[in-house]
Structure formats: C-alpha cells, structure tokens
Regions:
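Structured C-terminal helix/loop/strand segments within mature extracytoplasmic catalytic/sensor domains
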Residues: 2-16, 29-46, 154, 201, ...
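Beta-lactamase-like hydrolase cores
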Residues: 32-76
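Short, well-structured active-site flanking segments
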Residues: 94-113, 162, 213-216
Length: 311
C-alpha cells in the first residue's frame, strides 16, 4: 500500500492553523446569555429524535474555541466500537513525537494476524509488513481491525492507550480489549466505553488542542476527512460545503443490541471547528447487517449539529 499522508498533511494544516484566529475573535468565552437556551433547545431536539427512533442515543456537541456545548445523555457510557481508532492513532502519533516510533517504521505481520475485517492489511499481507503511518491510515479510513491491533501492540496494548487518554485529561474513556472482542459490551459493562461528552473533549484535545503537534493534528484530521465508512452518518447531515472528518464505529450481531456510532470534526465557514460525538443503540437486536434507518439517526444528528453551530 502506498500512503499519501505527506501530500495530504499540507492540505490539512490550513484549517488547524485558523483555530488561533477564532480564539482571538471569540476571546475563548461563550455568550452566557444565549448558550443555555440554545443548549436546552438542542437537547430537546435530540431527545425527540431518540423517542422517534427508539433505542438509546447519546450525543455531545463542543465548540472547539468557546467551549459551548449541547448534549443528550452526554455523561452516560456507550460502547466505543471502532470510534476508538481515531484517538488510538493520536496515541501512536504522540509516541512518534517522543521518538519511540517512526512513521515509516515497518510493522511485520502475517496471515495468522488477519481478522475477519481487514481490507487493507489483507491486501498487503504478502509484503510481510506495513509502516506505522500506513496502519494508522488504514484503521481510520477503512476501520481495518488488524491494523488497529497491530498499532496497539506498539504501545503496550489497550492499557497503554488508556494511560495516554488519562494523561490528556480524559478520566472516562477506557480501552480494555483488542478487536473484535472489544465490541462485545453489554449493559453495565464499562469495558471499552466512553461518554459522548468525554469523547468530544478528547477530540478537542487531539484535533485542535495542544495534545499533539500541528503536523500530527493535520495527519489525524486528513485521515478523518478521507474516511470511507461514514457517508450515511453524521456527514450525511452536515452541509456538503463544510470540511468534515469522522470515524465510525459499528457493532451488529444476531444476539446483541446493534450499535451505530460516529465521531467527527467539522469546519463551519464562519465559525471555529465543532466536535461531535454520537453513539446510538438501535432498538433492533436480531439484525446481522447494518440498517439504513439506524444510520439515518446519526445523519439527523449531523443536521442538528449544523443548526446548533450556526445558531
């Protein structure tokens, strides 16, 4: 696999650099008079969406500069599924910045390492290795599970990822198991879970904050923009002329509540970047394939997010 991360990195740095200007204009302070009303109205819309769709919906919106928020079930825990792969790659990039790993470092693997869903690693298994950068790109853009497990092996496993989340100030998000076991989360099980509010805050730290260098942030954002799995979710509801990147997560089986997740950063043309974390548990238990009507719930969340950002 030939990675194009160096070429795309330059394109991604422009919106990241623009965050500082918005911080100066906004004074890093939300409008105390209008924010609560907007947040309450948005929370009501999200609650109404959940009632119409059935199931359980958790959402958090976060203005990356002012800190303005809106949420529904923002503090409740939800299974991350593959949404963990975006912050996982941030942990890898932190290790690169610290000299512990290199972007072009080859990571060996073989047929025995391949999981059921491994589109990129399977296509390249004959080469015997992929680079760290290629694995990050694969696990974000296609949600390649083998790539995620190989990356976890470089940082001390799930516990290593969780330690870095804590170092970045996230006391909620936790990764406990590898793919695919980490998707098996039942009610009351805190393993491999996050809350929408915690995830939105973590995204703020790694995508627009100072947790990573501008170059690393640009890589993460660019891979999110290139993601191929989220076109029917948040990005389907966000305006097409807003630059948006996301990472999906899905857990669908014959004997578990189906999970449809998506986390995103989006760039309104007249405002600072907005972080979105959306986690949806479908009322359908027995489905063994993704349902468009469940993904449409997240598309509606995207539309609500756009209106909230504009207001």
């Amino acid at each position: 696999m030939t990675s194009a991360y160096s070429r795309r990195r330059l394109l991604s740095m422009m919106p990241v650099a623009g965050v500082g200007a918005w911080a100066l204009l906004a004074g890093c302070k939300a409008d105390a008079g209008s924010a609560p009303k907007s947040a309450d109205a948005t929370a009501d819309r999200l609650a109404a969406l959940e009632k119409r769709a059935g199931g359980r919906l958790g959402v958090a919106f976060l203005d990356s500069v002012t800190g303005r928020t809106a949420s529904h079930r923002g503090g409740e825990r939800f299974a991350m599924c593959s949404t963990f792969k975006w912050p996982l790659s941030a942990v890898i990039l932190k290790a690169v910045e610290g000299g512990k790993l290199m972007l072009d470092q080859p990571v060996p693997y073989g047929v025995s390492d391949l999981l059921e869903f491994a589109p990129v690693t399977r296509a390249n298994v004959a080469t015997g290795s992929m680079t760290v950068a290629e694995l990050m790109e694969a696990t974000i853009t296609t949600s390649d599970n083998t790539a995620a497990n190989l990356l976890l092996g470089l940082i001390g496993g799930p516990a290593g990822a969780t330690r870095q989340f804590r170092a970045w100030g996230d006391a909620v998000t936790r990764l406990d198991r590898l793919e695919p076991e980490m998707n098996d989360v039942v009610a009351g099980d805190e393993r491999d879970t996050t809350s929408p509010t915690a995830m939105a805050g973590l995204l703020r730290a790694i995508l627009v904050g100072d947790a990573l260098s501008p170059t690393s942030r640009a890589l993460l954002i660019d891979w999110g923009v290139a993601t191929e799995t989220g076109y029917k979710r948040l990005r389907a509801g966000l305006p097409s002329d807003w630059r948006s990147g996301d990472k999906t997560g899905t857990g669908v089986s014959a004997d578990r509540i189906s999970k449809y997740n998506d986390i995103a950063i989006t760039y309104p043309p007249k405002g600072p970047p907005i972080l979105i974390a959306a986690y949806y548990e479908s009322p359908v238990i027995s489905s063994q394939k993704m349902r468009d009507e469940d993904q449409a719930v997240l598309a509606e969340v995207g539309r609500i997010a756009a209106e909230w950002a504009a207001g």
